[in-house]
Every structure is written in structure tokens, then in C-alpha cells.
Amino acid sequence: MQTHEIRKRFLDHFVKAGHTEVPSASVILDDPNLLFVNAGMVQFVPFFLGQRTPPYQRATSIQKCIRTPDIDEVGITTRHNTFFQMAGNFSFGDYFKKGAIEFAWTLLTNPVDQSGYGFDPEKLWATVYLDDDEAIQLWQEVAGLPLERIQRRGMADNYWSMGIPGPCGPSSEIYVDRGPEYGIEGGPEANEDRYIEIWNLVFMQNERGEGTGKSDFEILGPLPRKNIDTGMGIERVACLLQGVDNVYETDLLRPVIDAVAARAPRGYGRGSHSDDVRYRIIADHSRTAAILIGDGVSPGNDGRGYVLRRLLRRVIRSAKLLGIDDAVVGDLMATVRDAMGPSYPELVTDFDRIQRIAVAEETAFNRTLSSGSRLFEEAAQSTKAAGADRLSGRDAFTLHDTYGFPIELTLEMAAEADLAVDEEGFRSLMAEQRQRAKADAAARKQAHTDLTAYRELVDAHPTQFTGFDELTTEARILGIFVDGRRVPVVGHDTATAQHRIELVLDRSPFYAESGGQIADEGTITGTGASQTAKAAVSDVQKIAKTLWVHRVTVESGEFVEGDTVTAAVDPRWRHGATQGHSGTHMVHAALRQVLGPNAVQAGSLNRPGYLRFDFNWQGALTDDQRTQIEEVTNEAVEADFEVHSFTTELEKAKSMGAMALFGEAYPDEVRVVEIGGPFSLELCGGTHVRSSAQIGPVTILGESSVGSGVRRVEAYVGLDSFRHLAKERALMAGLASSLKVPSEEVPARVAGLVERLKAAEKELDRMRLANARAAAVNAVAGAERVGKVRLVAQRMAGGMSAGDLRTLVGDIRGKLGGDPAVVALIAEGDNDTVPFVVAVNPAAQDLGLRANELVKQFGAAVNGRGGGKADLAQGSGKGAAGIDAALAALRAEIDRS
């Protein structure tokens, strides 16, 4: 049975049983705790928690899922995959255990000609949670499953959660016995190679708290109602119904393996385990990469972007290790499209963008492979020259950090060079880097607060946001927090600058930071008996998307929980913020007009007077494109388009053409911001101007790369734009005055001066080298005898580069004849650098002298290092004070030889 038929039968089965078919959500959601969607129930979490009322009591879906913790195991075993499809049926307060078991058993065991999968009931097993006697009884009554094929298991196996705070509950898993050829009997408890799990029925009835692992967490209490969440692995069912041993042999991944085999000199399944691993890595990672790019992820250096980059680079590396030297990723994306397109049409409609981003990453990584390979060769040579047999952790870290080399690639290249790698040192450096990154992140954002301190308020008292309609609101203090701890009162006398003071209000006009718009600033003041209390608001964050937490500095008086206060947004701040946010929408619309619909938003930041917009695009914008984008934006500003917002159903908004951005999780009812009718239409929860003319002029400051396939546009708006233009006008006037030309002639005059300066520098370099060569002739005549070796060791004039020194060394070495000779030149370079070059002719090498050993004497004396080969080596240090000591150390080393 083909995979598309397996999917169809699943959905049809549950739709006929009164379930609403719900499309798969994106694999990326607006949840900082979840890197990727990893379960079918993720998009339904608000329904399970009772935060939103579901529009249906029964639902079914096939969710795209990504799990990457075991990425290094992919290919080594055939059980691990980074992408999988989870088919599920869900009940929100409707049927519970009996219905879930009945629906699953019917679909699995019904004959193929009756729309089932046709599994033999005698080969099916079930596991249940330790004390779930009810589930055991239902399996016997509903399915007729004998007690000997039902096993009890603990929390690690049969109690399900997402691994983070949220809904959870006991589960019952269904297994298929593949037969004695796959191992010993005894059920899932004895052998999970023979007994394969295909369906997990979760009886979602509790909410869990913080904790680690599969069982170390607190059960906070029951959910508002009992729910059902099930997950059937499409890939595993496909293996069984297609009669193959693993997912790589199914119609999902085998086409990718065959496409690679058609180009590789060594085939799949020909006896080489390492080659088969590479084939499987390519097949798995290509599919996952296509899905990620299709859902809006671009290669980057952290988070989701880093995962995508790592996947693609493992594909490229594996292909090269299979002997495929040509570009391969573009063809792989096409093969994935053909295999997965029937189930995921976006892989077809958005194929050009998916392929372009993947190919651009391949091109970039091929360059880093070339550069990194040279660094690896140097490091390997230096390691061997030092008599060591292990590449240092520092070298491995540099290859990873600078060139993007996976440690696996370094290990393989080292093995080919008969070297080991200091993996412990590498991991230590990686840990230090991660720790620095965490510390930096904490320093940048100290507003992170443990949710448990706010749980009572989150659940019972969500904040009402009034800021769309007013800037001043009467409110009541719901809670006061000092450094994350709830207190009844806080005052100016007790709150120091070192304390993090936060006020939670029942109503607030302050916009809480989200959607790229930074938070409002303003004041909170007391009323009545507390009218002396005043606090400056510097930041506002959302907790669980419903509670506004105001970061404040108490300037006078004291605030008491329950007091009535006046919350007032600074109107100038809000106006500037709305200019920036509306300007972001305008620039986004202009970008899409100029570049086309593939210029998809990847991030944004807007604050008073400034906006920053990241978008997916390959290659830098041309000057003409930049100019066009700026012109289209300002023409729309000048047109004074009306800006208005309205709420509507999500699907209706999408049908109107509203931009729904990748990775955002939207409710059923959404807010749409419209600027000038068709000019800009986006789903947005931010604040905006009333008409486009209020934005003022928009000046694009520049455009740059912020990662592979992601560009950034920055701009000033409003008064800040005017000030920027005024500064540029004053700068141009000053240049024109200094150059004594009209403003319009300044560029030509500056270009002429630059050319003259370049010519003068070139002539200066020529004269410096000529003088150095003349000095070199004298150096040959004055060569000193050190033992059996003629030595030319000189300090050269300042300003010489390593390239200049290599040229001179070549001249001198050629004039010294065939006797043993060593040439060593060192100079004072720019910025206190000290370049040096050492050459050893063949006769001196016969005496045991090596340039790459002698160069170490220079490096030690001038706080530097160097490397190279036996005949020629070079390096660089810091500090000219050590030059004489370096020359003396060299003489002493030669004399000892």
C-alpha cells in the first residue's frame, strides 16, 4: 500500500466518524520552548488546556513533525529519522478511552477491501500505564485482545507529555509483532526490534509542570475536561504494509537513495556499512531540509536556521564521501518534491524558492570546504611535525566555528591522515562557547521570569489590553513582583536599581513587546490615597500571551496590591513606535512589489524612528532595487493611504490575500491591518498610524546579509529620517567646501583623489621593494657562517608584508648557491605586527634543518606562531621589541645543529 493511500485511509476513517479534518500546522510555531513541532497535538494545546474553545469536538490531522536530538544516529541505525508524519485523532471533551481504542482497532484490523489496513489481530499487542486497569479491561472488551498480549509499563514508556509544561496523561501503545526472524518473543517489554510501536493513544487528562526527563515532573492537576490525543506513525505503518524492513526502503525515501545511487560510484546495499549510512543520511536530511525551507526556515548560525544548515551540510559532506564531486542538492530537492508533493503541495508550488535556498547553501559550504580543507592540512602537518598523533581540540573547534565543519567531518579527515582528534578538548571549547552565548543572551534579556510565579494570575486574571483605543487607562494592581517573587507592597525607599520590579495590571494601554515591535514606555501613577506613587515603565512583556508584566522603576511613594492606578503611555513614544511598525509593513509591501512574492519576511524590529526588516533572499540587492524599494515606499507614504484594522476568521483573512507569516501561530479570529486597500494586507497585532502620511519620509540606510539566504534592510522613518538626511546634507556641503567644487561634483572629485592615492601607494610599495632588494644583494655578500651553514638573518625595513618577505627570500636563496644555507627575514609590519619568513635549501635540509621547525624560534620570541614546509615557512607575531631576540634564537638553534 503506497503512503498516499495510507494517509487517505486514515483521514477518511475519522472523517466518516464525525471528525473534522484539520491541515498540518507549520513545523515552526511561535513558542520559545519548542524548536520544532514534534507531535500531532501541538496545534491543539490551547484546546486541551481550556485556553480556547475548539470549533469542533473531534478532529483528525496528519502533522509534519521534526525531532533532531538524535541527528547523529540517523543513518547509523534505520530507526532514527529527523522528519516524520504523525497521523492523529483528537477528542476535546467528547469520547475518551473506549472510543479511542475502538477507532484505532477498527482501522488497523479491518480488511483492505473494507477501507482498513488489514493487520492480523493475532499479531497486535498493547501496552498500558501501570495502574490503568480501565484500559486493560477495554482492550479485552472492545478489541478482544487477550490479557497475555497486554503489558503494563511505567511513566517513561506509557505516560506522555511534550517534554515541557503542558497537557499530559497516561497512554496505551499498539505494537505489531514482526515475527521470530526479528528477535525473541515476549512482547514489547522484551524486544522492541521485533515488536514495533505503530500507534500511541494518549488519554490526555492532566497538566504537568517543570521537570526533566520522561518522568521527573510534577502533575499540577486535572485538565478542564478529558481529551484524547493519538499518534500513528505514517512511516512505520508504511514499512509494515509495504513489506520492507525500514523507512529507507519505502516509497518515501527509496527514490532519494536511488537518485543518489545513479550518480555515486559505489551503490547502496553493496556491503559497505559506512556508504549505506551516508546514503541514509542524504535521504533523511534532504527530506527534512525541504520541509523546513518550505515552512520558512533559512540556513543560519543558531536555532532553527542552524539545524537546517547542519542538515544540508551533512547531505553535502555525505555525497562527497560517496564520490559525488558535482553539485547534488538541487536534484535532491526535486526528488523530494516528486516523492512528497502529493501529500504536501507546497513543496511543488514553492519549489523554486526551496531549491534556490538549498543550492545557495551548497555553494557556500563548498567554498568553506575548500578553505577549511586548507586549514585542516596545515593543522595536520603542524601536528605531525610536532611528533603528535592527535589534532588539538582548538584546531577542531576553529574548523567548526570558523568554517562550519561538523566534528564528524574533522574526525573522518583526521582518520584519513592517521590522526586522532582531541574530542574532549573540542567539546570543552564548544561548552564554553555555549555558556558565553547563554550569558550574553541573559545579559541582553533579563526579563525572563519563571512562569510558576505568575501561574495564578495567568490562569485567573488575564490582562485586558486597551491600547488600541486609548493611551491612558484606569487599572487595578493584580500583583507586584520583586526579582520574580510576589510581594504585597513595593516602595521607592525599598526598591533599588538592582531590583527587578514588575507590576501586573488588570487593564493596560501599554503595548507588550511582540511581533517585532518593542514595548511602550510611560508611567504608572497612584490615585486617591496612593497618589504620591509614581513609576516609570521601561519595558512590558507578555506571560503566556495573556498577562502584561510591566517592568518599572519606582520614583516616589509606594504601590500596594489591589490599589487603583493610572497607566499612561508616553504619546511621543507610541507615535514613534507606530511610525516604525507601519513603516515596516510599507517596506515589506514594497519589497514584494520589487522582488516578487519569494521575498518572505524572516524577522523584524521596529522602534520609534527606526525599522529593521529581515527577509529570505539570495544575493545582495542592486542599487537600482534599493532605490525602487525606497521610492515605492515613499510614494505610498505620500499617497496618504488610510490605515485601518479589523478582525475576521483566519481562513477568510488568508482568502483575502492577507500575509500570514511563516512560523506564526494564529488563533481562529485574527486581526488584519490594511494599508491603502491592496497595497498592504497583513495579519498583525501591533499598533499603527491612522494614515500612511503620518509615517513621514522613509530613508533606507543600507542592506546587508545576516545569514545565508537572509538579507536585512534598515531604515529611518519620520523625524529621524529627516535628521539623517539633514546630517548627510551637511556632510556633503562640508565636503564640497573642502574640495572647492559644487556638491554634484563631489563624487567624481573623491573618486579621482582615491585613484591618485592608490597610484601613490603602489609607487611607494614598488620603491620599498626595490630598496629591499638592493639590501638583499648586500645581505648575500655579508652572509655569516654558523657552523656548516651560510646564514642570512636580517631585520628588514618597516611596512613590509609577508608576501614581500617571501619575494626577497627567493631572491637571496637563489644567490647563495648549493652550499647549506638558511635565509630568515623579519620585519615590522602594520599595526605592530611582525611578519617573518624562513627558507632552508636542500643542502641545509640534509643537515637536519627544517624551515617549519626554525620558524618556531621566531614565533616564540615575538609572541606569534608559524608553520609551513621543510623548505619554506612563515608566520606572524606581535611586538617589534622581540625581533633581535628572535634572530639570536635562530642563530643559536642553527649552531646547535
From Swiss-Prot:
<dbReference type="GO" id="GO:0006419">
    <property type="term" value="P:alanyl-tRNA aminoacylation"/>
</dbReference>
<keyword id="KW-0067">ATP-binding</keyword>
<keyword id="KW-0862">Zinc</keyword>
<feature type="binding site">
    <location>
        <position position="684"/>
    </location>
    <ligand>
        <name>Zn(2+)</name>
    </ligand>
</feature>
<keyword id="KW-0963">Cytoplasm</keyword>
<dbReference type="InterPro" id="IPR009000">
    <property type="entry name" value="Transl_B-barrel_sf"/>
</dbReference>
<dbReference type="InterPro" id="IPR018164">
    <property type="entry name" value="Ala-tRNA-synth_IIc_N"/>
</dbReference>
<dbReference type="Pfam" id="PF07973">
    <property type="entry name" value="tRNA_SAD"/>
</dbReference>
<dbReference type="InterPro" id="IPR018163">
    <property type="entry name" value="Thr/Ala-tRNA-synth_IIc_edit"/>
</dbReference>
<protein>
    <recommendedName>
        <fullName>Alanine--tRNA ligase</fullName>
        <ecNumber>6.1.1.7</ecNumber>
    </recommendedName>
</protein>
<dbReference type="InterPro" id="IPR003156">
    <property type="entry name" value="DHHA1_dom"/>
</dbReference>
<dbReference type="GO" id="GO:0000049">
    <property type="term" value="F:tRNA binding"/>
</dbReference>
<dbReference type="InterPro" id="IPR045864">
    <property type="entry name" value="aa-tRNA-synth_II/BPL/LPL"/>
</dbReference>
<dbReference type="GO" id="GO:0002161">
    <property type="term" value="F:aminoacyl-tRNA deacylase activity"/>
</dbReference>
<dbReference type="GO" id="GO:0005524">
    <property type="term" value="F:ATP binding"/>
</dbReference>
<dbReference type="InterPro" id="IPR050058">
    <property type="entry name" value="Ala-tRNA_ligase"/>
</dbReference>
<comment type="function">
    <text>Catalyzes the attachment of alanine to tRNA(Ala) in a two-step reaction: alanine is first activated by ATP to form Ala-AMP and then transferred to the acceptor end of tRNA(Ala). Also edits incorrectly charged Ser-tRNA(Ala) and Gly-tRNA(Ala) via its editing domain.</text>
</comment>
<keyword id="KW-0479">Metal-binding</keyword>
<dbReference type="GO" id="GO:0004813">
    <property type="term" value="F:alanine-tRNA ligase activity"/>
</dbReference>
<keyword id="KW-0648">Protein biosynthesis</keyword>
<keyword id="KW-0547">Nucleotide-binding</keyword>
<keyword id="KW-0694">RNA-binding</keyword>
<dbReference type="GO" id="GO:0008270">
    <property type="term" value="F:zinc ion binding"/>
</dbReference>
<keyword id="KW-0030">Aminoacyl-tRNA synthetase</keyword>
<dbReference type="Pfam" id="PF01411">
    <property type="entry name" value="tRNA-synt_2c"/>
</dbReference>
<feature type="binding site">
    <location>
        <position position="688"/>
    </location>
    <ligand>
        <name>Zn(2+)</name>
    </ligand>
</feature>
<dbReference type="Pfam" id="PF02272">
    <property type="entry name" value="DHHA1"/>
</dbReference>
<keyword id="KW-0820">tRNA-binding</keyword>
<comment type="similarity">
    <text>Belongs to the class-II aminoacyl-tRNA synthetase family.</text>
</comment>
<dbReference type="InterPro" id="IPR012947">
    <property type="entry name" value="tRNA_SAD"/>
</dbReference>
<feature type="binding site">
    <location>
        <position position="581"/>
    </location>
    <ligand>
        <name>Zn(2+)</name>
    </ligand>
</feature>
<dbReference type="InterPro" id="IPR002318">
    <property type="entry name" value="Ala-tRNA-lgiase_IIc"/>
</dbReference>
<dbReference type="InterPro" id="IPR018165">
    <property type="entry name" value="Ala-tRNA-synth_IIc_core"/>
</dbReference>
<dbReference type="GO" id="GO:0005829">
    <property type="term" value="C:cytosol"/>
</dbReference>
<keyword id="KW-0436">Ligase</keyword>
<feature type="binding site">
    <location>
        <position position="585"/>
    </location>
    <ligand>
        <name>Zn(2+)</name>
    </ligand>
</feature>
<dbReference type="InterPro" id="IPR018162">
    <property type="entry name" value="Ala-tRNA-ligase_IIc_anticod-bd"/>
</dbReference>
<dbReference type="InterPro" id="IPR023033">
    <property type="entry name" value="Ala_tRNA_ligase_euk/bac"/>
</dbReference>
